[in-house]
Each structure stands twice: as C-alpha cells, then as structure tokens.
C-alpha cells in the first residue's frame, strides 16, 4: 500500500487526521543516532510488585506504616487484610494456598515468596486480580493509593510483592536504566492500555445504547469515576469482594474502557454462522466495531518509516492451534487488529501485523538476521507475558531477558533503543500516586527498562513517564505529527500543575 493510498483510506474511514498538526517539530540533536526502536510489552505488574527493592529506586524500603496502610470501604483503617478470595494461587496449582491459609495478614504489604510465609516463588501462578477502569480509580482514591484492598476482588493479594533480585531482568536493569516513575497510560486493564501504546486514544462504540452492547454500559456515580455500589455489596472488604449495579465495558458516553474483542479474526468471538470467516460476529455484545482513530503506525507509514507489530503465536492462532496453557494467545492484546486500516485483506495488515512465532521464534529470527524495521513492537504469547491467573512471572521474565540478549547481539544493536515495560499494574498495589491528568489516566506505576548502547548505564531514571512516552520518543525521532491524545494529555497535565511526561531521552546519552 502506498502512502497516498493509506492516507486516502484513512480519510475515507472518517479518521481524525484533521485534529493532527500538519507539521512536526524536527528531531532534537542526537535522536537520529537511534535507527531502530524496539518496544516489548509484558503484562500486569506494578513497580512495587517486582522492583520495590531495587537499589536507588523509589521503593518499599523507607515507607512508613501509614503509607502502606489500607482503608476499608467506609474510609476507616482495616484491622487486617482480608484473605485472598478463592485462594492465593491460580486454579490447578498444587499444592494451593487456599483462602483460609491466606487469612489474617497484617494491614501491610507482604512478600508472596517469603520463605517464612507463603513461600510461593515467581515460578508459581497466582490468581488473577481485578484491573479495571473504574475500580483502579477507586483504588487510587484521589492519589492516596489506600483503597486497593477495598475495591479488589482478590482480597489481600493486591498487597503482595516479590524479591525481584532473583529475576534475570533485574540484572538487565542494573546494567542499563530502570525507570522508577513510569505510569501506565490509562486506568484499567490490558485492552485500554494497548490502545494507549498504539494511538494514545480510547476506542468508541457508537450508539451503544441501541446496540448489542447496551447491557455493558456501566452504572457510574455523578463524579464519573466511581461505579455505583449494589445494595447487596458487603459493607466491608473483610466481608467479601464488592458488588456493583453494573460494571461493564462501556462508559455512559460510549467509550470502550474494559475488555472488548477485535472485530477481525483472530478474536475470541468467532465469525457469525454463514458470515465472513475473517470477521468476528458483530452481533456478539463483546465485539468492538472497527476503529478509525489515527495510530502511531499510520503516522510512521505516512512518513515512509518501516514498522511492525510482532505478536507471539499469531500465525499459530490463525491456524487454529491456540490452546491453554500454551501458547494461550490473548486476542485483546493486539491493538491494530481493532482498526479498519488494518482489516483482513488490506496490504497494510500484511505488511505491519506480523507473526512473532511460537515462543517469539520469528521475532528473534528477525533480530538475529538484522531485519527488524525501524520501529518494532513485540507482544509475547500468553504463557510468557507474566499475567496473573494464567502465567507466572519467572517464565515471562526469562523470555524478556532472552530476547534482550538476542537484541544485544543483533547487527542493528549499535544504533538501537529497546524499551521493555508492562501494559498495566494487573491490580497490584503501588505506593506512588499517579500524576493527575485527564479522564483516562495515567494509572498506576509500572516497571520500565530503557536499554541501548546510548543508555546512561547502571542508573535509575526518576523522570516522569507514562506509556505515551514511548510514542513521544518515536514521534520526536521520526519528525511525526503529534497524536491528539498526547496533545490532550499534555494540556491536562499543565491544567493540573503537573510536570510534563518525558520522552525517554533523559535515560540516554545522545552526545556520544
């Protein structure tokens, strides 16, 4: 597909190109030393959950009891943590840590892998936790981060953390740069935070109130940030998980903020009977209509910059070989598969949505062969992404470190920037309040690694970043127009007297 054809198709699709500035600011000096940008997107860990003990980072070591203490739903301190409802370990783990065994923990953060406690190492899969748009805002509690337990479905598990020093990526962090002030782009889960990486935008469901999704419109209080609590919800977090009038995927003004399925295969929603086999059934209430916002990929293509999204186990899933627990391909982790510009049959889809291979083999082959495009995004398959409930930390972390090792040996390494981060916190508590910005975020703090021959080696970067900081660097490096969501985030930060988000360059020495 030519740049002109792509531009025309985007306009005809009703995109927001008119809201994107027509010109871009020239790249700052030194940015052109980076020829290859690689973004690796893991899953569902807060900074404190894995890196709260990292030397020099803003972690857990010096926190007072008051900074950790959690409040009940009535605003009073909990006398203890509730048990991990349903058990601390995921279904099928043997021996399990049961709900009863997890009861009566003190009101504090605790080590999941403590040998004198639960002794559940990073190789053990723990249960999943709520990580949803409205609940996260309720947990943050206006920046106090003191109601994570109150508005969780997993009881006290949200306060758990690990000794991250046993992880291979800990050594990578010590060698390169660990960012300890990096926040997920949006409140909530993977679905929305993958859109933040692709377009700094929030998907929409037009006319949701008259569509199959009408039952998923959330019941929200007048403040717009709090779900309406059901009459039969337990008054205390010690009595069980909260219940809501309607905790759906759609906001009252029809934005999709919790998990919806792609309109194109591969999707968790199969094609309609007798319908196009390349399309998910649009009548299913969890199928999101095709989206038309401008993405970072669109802007790169219009500038003639090569790029690709590599999805682990993409082709295997298209071939009907997805399975649980391996590879456990996650359909809603593929943001470009929601956009009309990359619909089945388009040249753009063929060029830019690539198979990362089983266990990342195809992505690693491109690394080893020196054939990565200028900008690459890599999404590991489900069992290697560290998501609670179906993946363990150790396997995913080892995979990340293995990929980094290949990148260090790549023919393209000498002018490469690698960013390894997580999509969101996965429901786990973190003690740092997110900066106040716009309606969508940013959400909680997550680990991020800046890896490059130009990295300020062996340092912790305290610069304020969020997921859009990755897009900011790409935008600056390739002289792209600024996505409207980034413009809006910048304005919101200024309006709330918050510092701007960095573009990752503070972690680099581009004067070499």
Task: Describe the function of each predicted region.
Residues 2-24:
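Gram-negative bacterial Sec-dependent N-terminal signal peptides
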Residues 24-512:
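N-terminal pro-sequences and low-complexity stem/linker regions of secreted or lumenal proteins
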């Amino acid at each position: 597909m030519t740049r002109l054809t792509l531009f025309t198709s985007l306009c005809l699709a009703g995109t927001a190109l008119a809201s994107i500035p027509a010109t871009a600011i020239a790249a700052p000096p030194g940015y052109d030393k980076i020829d290859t940008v690689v973004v690796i997107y893991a899953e569902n860990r807060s900074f404190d959950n894995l890196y709260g003990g990292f030397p020099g980072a803003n972690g857990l070591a010096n926190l007072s009891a008051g900074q950790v203490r959690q409040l009940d739903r009535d605003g009073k301190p909990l006398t203890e943590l509730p048990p991990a409802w349903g058990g601390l370990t995921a279904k099928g783990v043997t021996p399990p840590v049961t709900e009863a065994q997890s009861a009566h923990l003190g009101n504090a953060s605790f080590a999941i892998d403590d040998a004198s406690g639960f002794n559940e190492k990073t190789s053990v899969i723990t249960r999943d936790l709520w990580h949803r748009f409205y609940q996260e805002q309720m947990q943050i509690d206006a920046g106090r981060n003191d109601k994570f337990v109150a508005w969780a479905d997993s009881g006290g598990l949200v306060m758990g953390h690990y000794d991250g020093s046993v992880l291979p990526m800990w050594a990578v962090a010590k060698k390169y740069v660990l960012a300890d002030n990096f926040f997920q782009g949006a409140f909530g889960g993977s679905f929305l935070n993958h859109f933040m990486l692709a377009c700094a935008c929030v998907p929409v469901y037009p006319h949701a109130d008259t569509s199959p999704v009408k039952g998923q419109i959330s019941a929200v209080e007048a403040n717009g940030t709090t779900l309406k609590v059901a009459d039969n919800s337990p008054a205390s977090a010690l009595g069980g998980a909260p219940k809501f009038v309607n905790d759906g995927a759609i906001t009252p003004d029809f934005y999709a903020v919790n998990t919806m399925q792609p309109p194109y295969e591969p999707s968790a929603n199969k094609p309609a009977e007798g319908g196009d086999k390349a399309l998910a059934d649009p009548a299913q209430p969890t199928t999101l209509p095709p989206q038309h916002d401008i993405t970072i990929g669109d802007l790169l293509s219009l500038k003639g910059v090569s790029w690709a999204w590599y999805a682990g186990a993409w082709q295997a899933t298209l071939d009907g070989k997805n399975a649980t627990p391996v590879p456990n391909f996650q359909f809603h982790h593929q943001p470009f598969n929601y956009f009309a510009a990359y619909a089945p049959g388009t040249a753009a889809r063929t060029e830019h949505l690539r198979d990362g291979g089983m266990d990342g083999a195809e992505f690693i082959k491109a690394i080893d062969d020196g054939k990565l495009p200028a900008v690459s995004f890599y999404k590991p398959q489900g069992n290697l992404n560290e998501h609670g409930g179906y993946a363990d930390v150790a396997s995913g972390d080892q995979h990340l470190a293995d990929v980094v090792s290949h990148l260090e040996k790549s023919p393209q390494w000498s002018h490469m920037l690698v960013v390894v981060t997580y999509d969101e916190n996965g429901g786990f508590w973190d003690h740092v309040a997110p900066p106040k910005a716009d309606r969508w975020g940013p959400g909680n703090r997550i680990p991020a690694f800046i890896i490059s021959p130009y990295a300020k080696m062996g340092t912790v970067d305290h610069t304020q970043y969020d997921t859009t900081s990755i897009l900011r660097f790409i935008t600056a490096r390739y002289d792209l127009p600024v996505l409207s969501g980034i413009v809006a985030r910048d304005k919101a930060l200024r309006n709330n007297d918050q510092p701007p988000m960095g573009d990752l360059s503070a972690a680099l020495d581009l004067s070499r």
